[in-house]
């Protein structure tokens, strides 16, 4: 089966993101196809490379990046939701008087059109 995952919870403070990540790992281990993960609402905070968990805590941002590198899973971040929450890529900084963006590597800003395309080609969408 083809899956798209929608993550609406932040990386820390709720279990939405960590549960989504564990579910994604399970999908891939059982040979399902994970087309993409779309981060929306507070879920866009998963793409903030300035998030620094304590040394003895699981680093969920690094885990998402590892999922992308190992399995080529697309990590889409809603552009509008990201801007509202202060997550921005370097290329968008020209007019904002900000020196460095904080969009983590492996994450890609996109619009809801990417979510719609993913939903269209997948068998299941699951929201966390």
UniProtKB/Swiss-Prot annotation:
The active site is at residue 78. It is an enzyme of class 2 (transferase). It comes from the Bacteria. Gene3D superfamilies: DsrEFH-like. Keywords: Cytoplasm, Transferase, tRNA processing. GO terms for cellular component: sulfurtransferase complex. It holds the Pfam family DsrE. Belongs to the DsrE/TusD family. This is Sulfurtransferase TusD.
